């Protein structure tokens, strides 16, 4: 036991230096402002008050939450059928399909998002195709639609993999038992398959929604600076404006929102696990 504690000590020190201290520093910056010659700073909540009393920042926060929700819903609607199909395939085909889904993830996300600029531009493949079928002068790049496409493209694999993991662990004898009891395919899916896959669905929702809320380079590249999300505001406060205190306050607010969402996800996972055990 003592040896294990000694082996864990370097990881504990690393976690404190790389995770805990930066978070504490951000919290500290969020509650201070410039002082006088005697006391260089003073405690204040003015940065939080500024955020919650400025309608522009609240609008951007709402926009970030809404587009993250849209991304999550689309990823779920697309990801579940794909994961279900993969789980129904034989092992060799499953491995091939999982490889094809994860293959783009081996490339840096920034590079993948940049590639969509060429696809969605006015001279790109998608706009040219839309022109051929009668939709002329369509502007996709630097719009909300472009940002949504980029979000779905980058985060869809996380949804698929989580749901596939739950479906692949499912006991197929339960489906056979449902069929023996007279349930048709639709009834079997909604009463057996879907409830048992809920842990994967909940995990997938978390892995898509949380990074979507705080994403900054996807809206920056595909939104062209015309579609700001809360991640862009934080980046702007730290790098461009130089208001580290206000940027830290926004970061803390987003972190608290994410912690709340994670608590809800954990609660949903426990509820799903209880239902699965009862099944």
List the predicted regions and their residue ranges.
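Transmembrane alpha-helix signature in integral membrane proteins
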Residues: 55-88
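Non-cytoplasmic
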Residues: 22-29, 34-35, 111, 159-160, ...
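Transmembrane alpha-helices
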Residues: 9-21, 99, 103, 153, ...
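Membrane-interfacial helix termini and adjacent extracytoplasmic/periplasmic loops
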Residues: 36, 45, 113-152, 186, ...
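Short membrane-interfacial helix/loop motifs at transmembrane-helix boundaries
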Residues: 20-55, 123, 224, 279
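N-terminal signal-anchor/first transmembrane alpha helix
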Residues: 1-26, 95, 255
């Amino acid at each position: 036991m003592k040896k294990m504690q000694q082996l864990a000590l370097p990881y504990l020190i690393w976690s404190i230096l790389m995770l805990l201290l930066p978070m504490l520093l951000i919290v500290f910056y969020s509650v201070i402002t410039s002082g006088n010659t005697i006391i260089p700073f003073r405690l204040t909540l003015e940065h939080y008050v500024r955020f919650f009393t400025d309608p522009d920042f609240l609008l951007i926060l709402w926009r970030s939450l809404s587009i993250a929700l849209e991304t999550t819903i689309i990823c779920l609607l697309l990801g579940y059928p794909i994961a279900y199909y993969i789980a129904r395939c034989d092992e060799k085909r499953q491995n091939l399909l999982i490889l094809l889904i994860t293959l783009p993830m081996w490339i840096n996300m920034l590079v993948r998002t940049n590639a969509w600029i060429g696809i969605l531009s006015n001279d790109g493949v998608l706009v040219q195709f839309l022109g051929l079928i009668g939709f002329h002068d369509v502007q996709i790049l630097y719009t909300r639609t472009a940002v949504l496409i980029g979000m779905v493209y980058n985060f869809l694999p996380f949804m698929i993999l989580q749901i596939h993991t739950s479906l692949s662990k499912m006991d197929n004898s339960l489906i056979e038992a449902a069929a023996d009891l007279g349930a048709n395919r639709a009834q079997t899916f909604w009463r057996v398959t879907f409830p048992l896959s809920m842990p994967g669905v909940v995990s997938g929702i978390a892995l898509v929604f949380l990074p979507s809320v705080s994403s900054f380079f996807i809206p920056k590249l595909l939104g062209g600076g015309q579609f700001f999300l809360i991640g862009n505001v934080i980046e702007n406060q730290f790098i461009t404006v130089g208001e580290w205190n206000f940027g830290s306050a926004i970061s803390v607010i987003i972190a608290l929102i994410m912690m709340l969402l994670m608590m809800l996800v954990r609660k949903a996972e426990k509820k799903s696990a209880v239902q699965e055990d009862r099944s």
